Amino acid sequence: MNWKDKVKTTFYSCDRFVRFVIQHFIQDDCTYIASALAFTSLLAVVPLMSVGLAIFSSFPVFQGLAEPVQNFIFDNFVPATGKIVQSYLQQFTSQVSKLSIWGIVFLIFTALLVMFTIERAMNKIWRVSSSRHGVSAFLLYWAIISLAPVLLGLSLAASSYLFSMPILADHRAPYTILHYSPFFLSLIGFTFLYVVVPNCPVKIRHAFWGGLVAAILFESAKHAFAYYLIRYNTYALLYGAFATVPIFFIWVYWVWIITLLGAEISYAFSVHHQRRGGKSLDGFSHALLWLHQLWLAQQHGKGLSFNDLVDASKQPFAVDVDEMINALIYHELIHATADGHYMLSRDLSHVTLYDLTQLLPYRLPTHLELQYSKASLAEQWRAAFKRHNEELKKSLDINLEELFKKTGTVIK
């Protein structure tokens, strides 16, 4: 393959990948989900700050760092209106100490609720039918809420210590690192979100690429939003002093748009069959292949993740993987477990190939399709499909004119 062909192939693959991301972004109603998450985030921002600061202040090593952490967050992650929003939120959080025990419980519940909403959105993108429940969900959400301020505090404490060292005091490198630290923190945060929150295994490299795109878009949006507010602040003219609220809501909305787009990119990298070349594996063989893989896993008492199923074939799939998953679940052939894996729902000793042809909306592969699926199909399957095609050919070996003559009258 010469360089021109390589360029064409790369361009075609990128075009398919981008189309896939856009299609799924629209299909998953990400704009609607982003608006719901933005509203939930506004309700939960005070509880989240209160819980985070309470955890942060409980560590003696972080005494005196609470205000620098807040300043760092609002200076680097909230454009233009950050200082005003910060002053309002500090007034709200200062009232938390006056709450009763039930008020504090409600605050914690609201903080956990936003995590549940985020997980549900991520599960929809990764096509996971079940969310975490009970203790496992609580522990994960609480770990994220409690670890985030601690890790941020550790990073700031480490930075302060390093910059105070005489050997680094006169060098420009530490300040260059500090300048780019918001970008790297965004990258780490997005990657962590895409790996941990979905209720299914997500490879770190796939989450990283989605996180990288999201971090770049986030930094770009931050500067663009700040520029717009400085040059064309329509909301300030309309709402006056009250303009901070709609501006902050719009900014949170766009943050969630970027976050969900990064999640769609991570998911697209996971479903790498969309970028494979070659002839597609037909729908019936695809279903049979996945049932076979699940049957093999069940012999060892295990289920398979979404990525495991996608990796079962080196060929691209003719039927979209989401459609196939939904078809197998709908016909009660497989089900999703609590940890996001898939397992068989039926005893396959009582399911015949004929049953499968009647259940699934996919026909048996033709002779031509069998030639292109040598890498994915066992010889026993190929022999059964070949016999079916030969018998079908004998049964339907009648020309249409003869068939119509036998019909006799015109069908009304």
From Swiss-Prot:
Protein's UniProt keywords contain Cytoplasm: no
Membrane topology: Multi-pass membrane protein
TM region positions: 36-56, 99-119, 137-157, 177-197, 210-230, 241-261
Localization terms from the record: Cell inner membrane
Keyword Mitochondrion: no
Keywords carried by this UniProt record: Cell inner membrane, Cell membrane, Membrane, Transmembrane, Transmembrane helix
This protein's GO CC annotations: plasma membrane
InterPro entries per the UniProt record, alphabetical: UPF0761_bac (IPR023679), Virul_fac_BrkB (IPR017039)
Record family assignment: Belongs to the UPF0761 family.
UniProt protein name: UPF0761 membrane protein lpg0643
Organism: Legionella pneumophila subsp. pneumophila (strain Philadelphia 1 / ATCC 33152 / DSM 7513)
